[in-house]
UniProtKB/Swiss-Prot annotation:
Keywords: Coiled coil
Disruption of the gene: reported phenotype: Both female and male gametocytes appear normal and fertilization proceeds normally. Meiosis is normal. However, ookinete maturation is delayed. In A.stephensi mosquito fed on mice infected with knockout parasites, the number of oocysts in the mosquito midgut is reduced.
Keyword RNA-binding in annotation: no
Biased composition (Basic and acidic residues): 340-357, 610-648, 660-686
Protein name: Ookinete maturation protein 1
Single Gene Ontology BP annotation: development of symbiont in host
Domain of life of the native organism: Eukaryota
Coiled coil (UniProt feature): 581-646
Biased composition (Polar residues): 171-180, 377-394
Function text: In the mosquito vector midgut, plays a role in ookinete development.
Amino acid sequence: MNRTHMPNNHKIHEGINMKSSINEVKKSKRIEKELSYVTNSTKKKSKKKQTNIKKIGDVSVNIENINIPNNLNLYTDNESVVSSKYKKKKKKKKKLNIYNNNDNSKYLKPQVVKKKNSKIIFLHHNENNTSTHSGESSKFQKLKKKKKIKKGTKKKSINKISILKHKSHESFPSTQNENTPELEPKQVNLSPLEIEINKTNDIDKHGLEINKTPSTQNFNDPINNLDNNEKIKDRGLFHGIDNIYENYITNDKENMQSVIKNRHYIIDKNEQNEQAYNNDMNITNFIKNGNTNKNSNNDKSANSNDYNKNLFCELTEAIENDGIEQTCNRNINIRLKEEKEAEEEERKKNEDEHILENGKSNNEDNSFDKKDDLTNLGKSFKNNESFELNSPQKNIRKGSLDGMRKKKISEKKMKTKIKQKKKRQNNINDTTIGKKKIYIKENNNERKSSGLILGFKKMKKKLSGKRIDQKKEYKEKEIYSDKLKDVIKDKKKYKKKDIDDISFTKDIVKENVKGVDRDDDEKKRKTIGQDEEKEKIEIIIVKKNETGTEEEIKVETDENPKVKTKEKCKIENGEGCKIAIDEENSVFVEAENMKNEAKLEADVIIIEDAELRKDEEEDKSKNNEKDSKSEERDILETQMAGKEEKPVLKKKKKNKGKQRNREGKGVVEKGYDAKREKKENEEKNKANTKMEPNDSIEQKDKLSNVQNMSNIVKNNKVNKILEKYIISKKEENLKRKYMNTKKFMDILDISEKKFKIDTINFFPHTIGQVCYSDIYFFFDTYEKELKKSNTGKNTIKLMKKLFKCEYIEMNNMELILQIFDKIIDKLKKELKTESIVKIYDEEEHVIASKIMKYKNGNYDKYMYNKKKYDSNNEYSISENNLFNQNPLHHQNNLFGCNRNKLYNIIFNSSQGEYIMGSHSFLILQQWNDEYKLAMLRDKLEQIKKRKQNMNDPIAKYIKSLKYGFIDSLFSICCLYDCKKNDNDASYCDFPLPSQNTFYTNTQIHLDNMNLNSERILPMKITKAVQILASS
């Protein structure tokens, strides 16, 4: 094919400045002279030289420019031949040693020229042994003959690179074959080069390496692909080159395939003489950057005057080439278009042929893509018209690039669609009808789905996964089929319950099932008939084992029964697949539902029809009965009231017309719609049948419902409070483990808390119950609203707080009482089985022993009193116990005290006063929490009375306050009325609870004593009052 010439791109370096105007005048004159020589020489000489070089596999050239110019070493690997010419300022000749690895004895002597222009010839692989005509060689020879005339001149010639392909090794350029006749150019396959540049500190020491390897990058990539290490800082004045890259395109398929194979297997892995470079570069980048850097680096070693002369010589030749080559490019573009149109037609034909063919390998598929890559190399040359004569840079039209991109995208889409069709046919079934063979591939990873059992898409994804043994797969299929059968049986049992009552539905079910069976039999007969028409068919089943090997199993289907048995087995396993063979192209696998599923659908439709009919009949019967009853009741009511009879409006019967229309259209109503209509009709009928109750009864029911709801809400609140108590006690127990045993925490200290705390002590009644500790509960019903947090212990302040009980809501008071009641109920059940209490540091047995010593010490006094008073005396032991508080009769009683002492103990006592063995400790030990609850209930009754008397005048209100104050004092001390005391009407005893009597046996007395098992301060009555007084 014809060669295409790339226009030269020239770029001016901004860092160089001219010396003076005198030098510029001299240089312009030299340019004019050289232009005249060039034009004359082109007209006279038309003959071009040609060289034929032997076919070479891999070419890699390493050129090392060293400070000493005499040393030049060219190394080649694997049948490589390199010829180069290097010269110095002197007129000495330089010979080149060309080494061939295959033939160590052969040395070739290329042509040696006396002139100073240096030329490097890069040799490429030539597969077809074709010869080409190089335009560059003719131009170089013209310049040589010019410079023979001017031997006295000391101009430094231009360093150039020419890329050639020649026929054989024997016709290497020498003195003998310079004047060989011209040969016509032939089709040549060119593979791209990858050029690597290694930048060193010294510009003269510059290494260049050229490897013929397959380049993945496009040839039109910009210069910015270079890494930072590859960018060259010092460039010449004009950044360009005169030589031209030759791009050859072919239409022959055989040549294209051979080039592709060689592109992948060119580089030798065991190259030792080459340097390893990490960065690659395209040919275009090398043409733009590589040679200019080399020229600039080599020229800097010479004088500055010679350096500038060579640059202007490059400028003159570039101007000529731009004018000549652009005209050539326009003619070449017309040829390229014609050639590409022919190529596209051939390409379409080839694609149609490959679609019909099957069994191609993946390597051949990839070859089509690589052919397209080579043919698309010429697309960048379509835009040559966009290059301007004097433009330093390449300007590409955007419209042309967008068009090419769209074409590429459309071509890729078509290719992907074609490949997908091939894969489906190859993976599922590869058939060749002419040979009458069927290839069916069965993979072990296939899993059945409910809708489509084969699952083509899932099969492709799971091919790369782990393989499953055939035995496991067979077991899974059996398990799956058994489950389906069980589910079907359950559904039938559930739905036959409604069908048993109706006789006519059974006949309908049988008819539908028979119809389904007939359809299935007809389909089977059709498939079997097609098989009979055809002759012997070989079914080859390809199974892939874990090792990757394939096993072929041939089955001759001369007899139809064998095929039938396979189909039956599949249907029993739940697959339900049928294979239908088409005469044209391939086997299509169609997944069908099982017989059982078809039966179920028929059953569902019939059962729904039966349910609707039942519902309609029941509605009719009920409506008729209710209408008759409602009419009779209306007549009775009118007779009792003496009113005239009113016409009774019958209800409209709905859903009859709608159901008929829906059934006509083929729509089946669902069961739950009919049930909803039933419920609505029943509710409406019940509302009519109910008699209107009396107003009084309704009001009572409403009140009872309201009370029940309020009780439920309160119970929920109580449960929440108790849950909070359990959580807080766990936290406190953790803290107290690390506390000192001597220091006791004040539980009632509420300075740092947002809620009020109260404690209730539940004391054990016998010594056997000492192991159970006391229980402490707290309540957060009332938030702290008082401004003064530190309240004193004076009695006046406590009395004032009692009057604030009127401002407390009644619901909150009732809630407290419910909490107390619930606590007591729990104690009766759980106190003996669980310890839901906090346990203090000091041991229980030690405390109990101290109490027993105190009691045994007083045993002598007890016996003295027993002798003094006989059993017949009116003051017997049963009457005169330790807890009798009458000072008139028992002045020497240890536990006798008056009202003031008890009052002081309750209100003005401190922790230091409660020492083990004191009378006040023992008295308060006997105090029971039931009295506290009674006090709270009494207080509630007082508050209710006060609210009722709020509307009375002020005088009555003040009196009620006085009496209320007195009552509160007595309630605090828990005193009885004076009238109840028979001994003295002016004196009120202290009726402390649980008065125990002494018996003759002291051990019985000790077992029945009420004791406090732990050294804990008992609760004051004032703290119980705080529940009421808190606000």
